[in-house]
Amino acid sequence: MKILIMGLPGSGKTYLAQRLQPLLGAAWFNADKVREMANDWDFSPEGRTRQSLRMKSLADFESVNKRVVICDFICPTAETRKLFDPDKVIWLDTIEKGRFEDTNALFEKPEKFNFRI
């Protein structure tokens, strides 16, 4: 099962993932750590697409091996969420604006989610 924890920067995604991961015994991928491993800090639409597909690839590997996996990342658009293709979505709707204006402008509130915090 792929769980996406999404929301604006500073909304608490990583905080929640850190606490949920041991409770579920899940694999966990944090977007900043994955970007660091890939040395890819491109936040253009193309860069965000690559990141979503990168996160999907890591999560799918865990899912195929019957592990629950948590991915925490902004996943700002309907398209990036569709590409990632989560089984469950937790939307952290805890702040009105994040610290990056470009992300605030790009962010689309999800129409589909399982939990909204």
Region roles according to the model:
Residues 2-4:
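Short hydrophobic/aromatic beta-strand immediately N-terminal to the Walker A/P-loop
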Residues 8-9:
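The conserved Walker
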Residues 13:
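Conserved lysine of the Walker
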Residues 17-60, 64:
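Conserved substrate/cofactor phosphate-moiety recognition/catalytic segment
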Residues 24, 85-87, 112:
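Short, structured coil segments at secondary-structure junctions
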Residues 45-100:
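Glycine-rich phosphate-binding loop used to anchor ATP phosphates in small-molecule kinases
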Residues 92-117:
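Conserved GTP-binding G-domain of TRAFAC-class P-loop NTPases and closely related GTPase folds
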